[in-house]
Regions:
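Short acidic, glycine/serine/threonine-rich loops at helix termini
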Residues: 17, 98-100, 131, 156-161, ...
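Short beta-strand segments
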Residues: 9, 90, 120, 145-151, ...
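Non-heme di-metal
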Residues: 382-603
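Condensing-enzyme catalytic core mediating Claisen C-C bond formation in acyl metabolism
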Residues: 1-60, 168-256, 351, 362-379
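Flexible, glycine-rich active-site loops centered on histidine and acidic residues
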Residues: 138-180
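Claisen-condensing/thiolase-fold acyl-transfer catalytic domains that form or cleave C-C bonds
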Residues: 63-67, 93-95, 107, 112, ...
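Short glycine-rich phosphate-binding loop at a beta-alpha junction
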Residues: 82-90, 277-286
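Acidic-glycine-rich active-site phosphate/pyrophosphate-binding loop
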Residues: 37-41, 96-110, 152-163, 229-238, ...
């Protein structure tokens, strides 16, 4: 049996609140206005909604927001709560710890006895609710089911809930989150009087076995979660609050993993034939900040699986980040706004940072007359060697991002806690390996046979461009108070020794095309990380431009280098054997580069 979304409803409380009006609702923040400006610029949110007045009084319950979204969807479909056989809800935090959120929404909604399910979690809990509703219809248990995602977070964002010790991991969320609810009606047949969305398939997977907790409440810090350490173990809620346990927090040091696992799952769905990028007409992606959009675009593009941005739809800027409700709030505007036409294929993507989950839903827009057409087609074409290579390299990069997130110095940079000593140590250790970069590229060029003269010329040009890069590191080191003699006579750490030895070994072979995998990792660090790191380091340490020249230069130069590299990776040079060797070398270099950075804290 097939399930169809036959109506979508949303509810956003109060009037839209602009950035200039935020403090009149949340009150003055305990941290600097500089942080607020930086977060608002990064997240791209211009308007949001709060179930709260200007005096800080909560005006509605979370269950009320959910009820209004459900009623909006049912009314649009011409149904009432008495027609509903199952109600599934998703939210981060209900109004009460007990009972379940779905029971509270049902109590307010009415409609007689029905099956209820409360999905816990963060952003993916809305999709979890949808999957439950879909399953209940597919299995023939219910004719009509409703799924709703709802969030009421504003009451936890008021300044009087925060102290100077709240910490950046809690404070920055004040400018990211807002209130709202979205709901969908799921039925066994398309609606007879308009368009419906056939649910072709849905996919939700957790990667919690690979990652620590990222977004949480109820503990002082994620690493301290153990028996006797949670908020329920304190003598009173006041004591838990005093320790900051009741704040919603997000570990920004590992947050970027969310992009990597999302793209990793996306590539898997493409390879299984469930997603065919060229056949997707609309992509609705939930992301908490515009900052992540460019990262998603870069990884999809590098994998050769990009869905053109003109097919993307988001209302983050105008509706805010409403967590579990966001994907439904987005779908409501697109569906009810006439964005879809019969035959259109829609892909929903929802990553969740709680402990790293990601979900996808594939929909097809149908009219009643064609609602019984077959499921979405899979990919039948054989995968070319270059296509396979680009997808494999994207997976290597995604796993490399995970490795980097566990490196202490990277976590400190990403979380805003790096010190000048950290930056000095980073420069010192990079310099010893960077100095040899041009040498191994030159050796590789000398071992490229005359049959590949154009590629040899590319290697030689690249070596010439990088032969004096280490001098920029020397100057940066001195500019932040380091001794030139110390950095010029420094030794490679064990990770750098292993990396250099591997690179020279590979470069000494005939036609060492596998080193394109090494370049993919090393140049990718410059293109994807250097610019971000230099911005964070400059802000954290209040450095001038002449103190961050190396990272600044490589943020731009490596982008140009990667463009040339991708031309080669897409060329006729690539056979399956060469592609496999490139992927193998990329994996090795990724691990050794991470080891090089890990060893900074062991020096």
């Amino acid at each position: 049996m097939t399930a169809y979304i036959t109506a979508v409803g949303a509810y956003l409380p109060g009037e839209p609140i602009g950035n200039d009006d935020l403090e009149s609702y949340l009150a003055s923040p305990p941290t600097s206005s500089r942080l607020r400006r930086r977060m608002l610029e990064a997240n791209g949110i211009e308007k949001r909604h709060y179930a709260m007045d200007r005096q800080g009084n909560t005006t509605m319950l979370n269950e009320e927001l959910a009820e209004k979204a459900v009623r909006a969807a049912l009314t649009d479909r011409g149904l009432t709560s008495r027609d509903v056989g199952m109600l599934a809800t998703g939210t981060t935090q209900g109004d009460l710890p007990v009972p379940g959120f779905a029971a509270m929404v049902h109590g307010r909604l009415g409609g007689g006895p029905m099956e209820v399910l409360s999905a816990g979690g963060v952003c993916c809990s809305g999709v979890a609710a949808l999957r439950a509703a879909e399953a209940s219809v597919n299995l023939g248990r219910h004719r009509v089911a409703v799924a709703v995602g709802s969030e009421l977070v504003s009451r936890t964002l008021r300044a009087d809930r925060f102290s100077d010790r709240a910490g950046f991991d809690a404070e920055f969320l004040r400018w990211m989150l807002s209130d709202g609810a979205g709901a969908v009606v799921v039925e066994e047949r398309p609606r007879p009087d308009g368009l419906s969305l056939r649910i072709d398939w849905s996919h939700l997977v957790s990667h919690a076995d690979r990652f620590p907790v990222c977004m949480y409440a109820g503990a002082s810090e994620p690493g301290s979660i153990a028996a006797g350490s949670t908020w329920q173990d304190r003598r009173s809620p006041a004591e838990a609050h005093a320790e900051g346990m009741l704040h919603l927090r997000q570990d920004v040091g590992i947050l970027n993993n969310i992009v990597a696992i999302g793209v990793e799952e996306y590539i898997g769905l493409v390879r299984s034939g469930q997603v065919v990028p060229d056949r997707i007409d609309h992509l609705l992606v939930h992301y908490s900040s515009e900052h992540f959009r460019s990262d998603i675009v870069d990884l999809m593009t590098e994998a050769g699986l990009m869905i053109p941005e003109e097919k993307w739809f988001t209302n983050l800027a105008t509706k805010g980040n409403t967590g579990a409700a966001s994907i439904f709030v987005m779908l409501e505007e697109a569906f009810n706004g006439g964005r879809f036409a019969p035959g259109d294929r829609i892909l929903l993507m929802v990553p969740e940072s709680g402990r790293f989950s990601v979900s996808f839903v594939h929909l097809t827009c149908v009219a009643e007359s064609d609602g019984k057409t077959g499921l979405a087609e899979g990919a039948n074409e054989d995968e070319g060697d270059s296509e396979w290579l680009l997808q494999e390299l994207a997976l290597v990069w995604a796993r490399f991002e995970t490795q980097l997130s566990r490196v202490p110095i990277v976590r400190r940079i990403e979380s805003g806690t790096a010190t000048l000593d950290d930056y000095r140590a980073l420069i010192y250790n990079l310099r010893q390996q960077v100095k040899e970069g041009a040498r191994w590229i030159t050796r590789a060029a000398s071992n490229v046979t005359s049959d590949y003269a154009d590629l040899r010329a590319e290697f030689i040009e690249h070596a010439a461009e990088e032969q004096l890069d280490f001098r920029m590191l020397d100057e940066d080191y001195v500019a932040i108070g380091g001794d030139r003699g110390v950095i010029e006579t420094g030794l490679k750490n064990p990770g750098s020794e292993a990396l250099s030895a591997f690179m020279f070994n590979q470069a000494s072979r005939e036609n060492p095309f596998d080193l394109l995998g090494a370049m993919y990792i090393i140049e990718g660090l410059g293109a994807n990380k250097a610019t971000r790191w230099v911005e964070m380091i400059r802000e954290q340490l209040e450095l001038d431009e002449d103190q961050v020249r190396f990272l600044t230069y490589h943020g731009g130069a490596d982008t140009e280098h990667t463009e040339k590299m991708f031309q080669i990776l897409r060329s006729d040079l690539i056979t399956r054997d060469i592609a496999e060797s490139i992927v193998h070398t990329a994996r090795v270099v990724a691990r050794l580069y991470a080891l090089q950075l890990e060893e900074i804290d062991n020096g």
